[in-house]
Amino acid sequence: MSAETAAANTATAPVPEVQEQESSKSKQVNLTPAPLPTSSPWKLAPTEIPVSTISIEDLDATRKKKNRTPTPKSSTATKWVPIKASITVSGTKRSGSKNGASNGNSNKSKNNKTAASSTSSSNANRKKKHHQHNAKKQQQMKKDGFESAVGEEDSKDATSQENGQSTQQQQPPHHRNHHHSHHHNSNGPQRRKFHNSNNAGMPQNQGFPPQFKPYQGRNARNNNNNRSKYHNHFHHNQQHPQQPMVKLQQQFYPVQPVLMAINNIARQIEYYFSEENLTVDNYLRSKLSKDGFAPLSLISKFYRVVNMSFGGDTNLILAALREIVANEAATVNVAEGTLAAKEGDNVTGEAKEPSPLDKYFVRSKSWSNWLPETFETEINIEKELVGDALDQFMISLPPVPQQEEESSTELASQEQETKEDSAPVAAGESESSL
């Protein structure tokens, strides 16, 4: 028994070497670094296709494909039928006893609608007859020789618009837009507004129409002898309700907008050659000759002058030039001469139509301060114009017909007679009442 127990104890007892190995393995831990990540957590763009190599054409093609809307497919069985609209009126449900009243109300509303439509149609017919009657009257008046009177009635709206424009032009106008070539060639800043300094010393009522101020130039000296020959004639015409008409470009215009246009053009021409404008107007300075003159035909193509002269009417521009020549206090000189032709001017070979503005030239009185470095324009001056040299371009006002004066006197006498007749009747009634 002792031998068996000894063998069992040896089998169950642990071996010391094996225990030491196991304890050493448990104490030693192998630490290895983590592997590098294969994909970025921020989801960056792949480096296989760089952004610089992507063509814009491919992007446009993809955008067009995305923006394409699917086209509807129509089969042969599709049939388009027009819609027949039916008007339905919604209302509250009522009992059978009230249906009769509702039907009666609906019938009354229908009758009212038909009556209103009939009255509107009758009014429309009356208006048509009235317009036809007026048209016949106008035709008859034209045949009898009263075309000017009819033209005045038709041009009331046009004159009101022109008066509004002319009053706006009477105010200091903004920097004018020159011809299209001026827009491309001028490099200066925007021009200042044109301030008219001659309105302070002018008399208010000189017999001219309302809002009309006779031209006295930019530097007025309160001269009453300003050679304005429109004064006496228009003072006589202002007493009559109808303004005389002036014929320009085969059309008749009232006198008031015509005279205001002449004055505005004269002031605008003086502004172009003022120190305020020439300091910034490189285009106009480049067109000056060695004597400081600029062609009037060039100035007439400027934007503001074209608008003020009813589309570039030469009669209005020459009338404004006459006002400048007749004004002793004008800030510009006007001369008569010829423009020397240069080689290469007429490249197309077309003959240029002559204009009455071609022989007139304008310059500032301080022209020596604004001469350009190189002269593009050559002008042969014949003489300077002063006084009444251009009186032939003054627009003549038509005389007032005497029939209007006779009719006005007859109306005044009739009113006096009616007043005299009514006075004793009132006195008799008062005596009978007492």
Curated annotation (Swiss-Prot):
<dbReference type="Pfam" id="PF05383">
    <property type="entry name" value="La"/>
</dbReference>
<dbReference type="GO" id="GO:0006417">
    <property type="term" value="P:regulation of translation"/>
</dbReference>
<feature type="compositionally biased region" description="Polar residues">
    <location>
        <begin position="196"/>
        <end position="208"/>
    </location>
</feature>
<comment type="function">
    <text>May overlap in function with tropomyosin and may be involved in organization of actin filaments. Acts as a multicopy suppressor of RHO3 mutation. RNA-binding protein which may modulate mRNA translation. Involved in heme regulation of HAP1, as a component of the high-molecular-weight complex (HMC).</text>
</comment>
<feature type="cross-link" description="Glycyl lysine isopeptide (Lys-Gly) (interchain with G-Cter in ubiquitin)">
    <location>
        <position position="342"/>
    </location>
</feature>
<dbReference type="GO" id="GO:0005829">
    <property type="term" value="C:cytosol"/>
</dbReference>
<feature type="cross-link" description="Glycyl lysine isopeptide (Lys-Gly) (interchain with G-Cter in ubiquitin)">
    <location>
        <position position="156"/>
    </location>
</feature>
<feature type="modified residue" description="Phosphoserine">
    <location>
        <position position="422"/>
    </location>
</feature>
<feature type="compositionally biased region" description="Basic residues">
    <location>
        <begin position="173"/>
        <end position="195"/>
    </location>
</feature>
<feature type="region of interest" description="Disordered">
    <location>
        <begin position="1"/>
        <end position="243"/>
    </location>
</feature>
<dbReference type="InterPro" id="IPR045180">
    <property type="entry name" value="La_dom_prot"/>
</dbReference>
<feature type="cross-link" description="Glycyl lysine isopeptide (Lys-Gly) (interchain with G-Cter in ubiquitin)">
    <location>
        <position position="301"/>
    </location>
</feature>
<feature type="compositionally biased region" description="Low complexity">
    <location>
        <begin position="218"/>
        <end position="227"/>
    </location>
</feature>
<keyword id="KW-0963">Cytoplasm</keyword>
<feature type="compositionally biased region" description="Polar residues">
    <location>
        <begin position="26"/>
        <end position="41"/>
    </location>
</feature>
<dbReference type="GO" id="GO:0070482">
    <property type="term" value="P:response to oxygen levels"/>
</dbReference>
<protein>
    <recommendedName>
        <fullName>RNA-binding protein SRO9</fullName>
    </recommendedName>
</protein>
<feature type="compositionally biased region" description="Low complexity">
    <location>
        <begin position="93"/>
        <end position="124"/>
    </location>
</feature>
<dbReference type="GO" id="GO:0005634">
    <property type="term" value="C:nucleus"/>
</dbReference>
<dbReference type="GO" id="GO:0010494">
    <property type="term" value="C:cytoplasmic stress granule"/>
</dbReference>
<feature type="region of interest" description="Disordered">
    <location>
        <begin position="396"/>
        <end position="434"/>
    </location>
</feature>
<feature type="cross-link" description="Glycyl lysine isopeptide (Lys-Gly) (interchain with G-Cter in ubiquitin)">
    <location>
        <position position="352"/>
    </location>
</feature>
<keyword id="KW-0694">RNA-binding</keyword>
<dbReference type="GO" id="GO:0045892">
    <property type="term" value="P:negative regulation of DNA-templated transcription"/>
</dbReference>
<feature type="compositionally biased region" description="Polar residues">
    <location>
        <begin position="158"/>
        <end position="167"/>
    </location>
</feature>
<dbReference type="InterPro" id="IPR036390">
    <property type="entry name" value="WH_DNA-bd_sf"/>
</dbReference>
<keyword id="KW-0597">Phosphoprotein</keyword>
<comment type="subunit">
    <text>Interacts with HAP1. Component of the HMC including HAP1, SRO9 and YDJ1.</text>
</comment>
<feature type="domain" description="HTH La-type RNA-binding">
    <location>
        <begin position="255"/>
        <end position="351"/>
    </location>
</feature>
<feature type="compositionally biased region" description="Basic residues">
    <location>
        <begin position="125"/>
        <end position="140"/>
    </location>
</feature>
<dbReference type="GO" id="GO:0003723">
    <property type="term" value="F:RNA binding"/>
</dbReference>
<feature type="compositionally biased region" description="Low complexity">
    <location>
        <begin position="1"/>
        <end position="13"/>
    </location>
</feature>
<dbReference type="GO" id="GO:0045727">
    <property type="term" value="P:positive regulation of translation"/>
</dbReference>
<keyword id="KW-1017">Isopeptide bond</keyword>
<dbReference type="GO" id="GO:0017053">
    <property type="term" value="C:transcription repressor complex"/>
</dbReference>
<feature type="modified residue" description="Phosphoserine">
    <location>
        <position position="148"/>
    </location>
</feature>
<feature type="compositionally biased region" description="Basic residues">
    <location>
        <begin position="228"/>
        <end position="238"/>
    </location>
</feature>
<dbReference type="InterPro" id="IPR006630">
    <property type="entry name" value="La_HTH"/>
</dbReference>
<feature type="modified residue" description="Phosphoserine">
    <location>
        <position position="55"/>
    </location>
</feature>
<keyword id="KW-0832">Ubl conjugation</keyword>
<dbReference type="GO" id="GO:0003729">
    <property type="term" value="F:mRNA binding"/>
</dbReference>
<dbReference type="InterPro" id="IPR036388">
    <property type="entry name" value="WH-like_DNA-bd_sf"/>
</dbReference>
